[in-house]
Amino acid sequence: LASGTGFAPIKALLEYMLHKGITRPAVLYWGGRRPADLYLDGWVREQLTLMPHLPYVPVISDALAQDNWTGRTGFVHSAVLQDLPDLSGHQVYACGAPVVVDSARAAYTAVAHLPPEEFYADSFTTEADKHKDPA
C-alpha cells in the first residue's frame, strides 16, 4: 500500500522481490490525488511483465475531468478493504502520508482482521503535518 511518494520504499520492496525471484502472492495498491501523482506508473507497468503474479491497483482520489481518469477512484486504503475484506493471514506494508497509514492500520486491524503485528509501516511527515496542533 503506497500513497503518493510513499511509493519509493514500496519500489525498493518490489525490486528486492524481483532480484530474489520472490513469487509469493502480493498486490500493489498505489494511491494519489491525481494521476500525475503516480509518478512511476510506467515503471510499475513495465515491471508487471517481469512479475505477472503481482496485480497492480492504482487508485485516484481527486481526479479532474481533464485527467480523463477511468481507473479506480476513492481512497487507496479503502480500495484494499473493498477487494480484500478479510486480511487475516496477510501482511501489509504501508508507506505514505501519516493519515493514510494510520487510517489503513486502524481499519485493517479493526475491520479486516489483520493481526496488528502483520502491519508494517513507514509514514512520512509533510510540512502541513508538522504545523498541526497535537490532539
Can you say where each PLM-predicted feature lies in the sequence?
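Reductase modules of NAD(P)H-dependent flavoproteins
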Residues: 24-135
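Short, glycine-rich nucleotide/cofactor-binding loops
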Residues: 1-7
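Histidine-anchored nucleotide/phosphate-binding helix
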Residues: 9-19
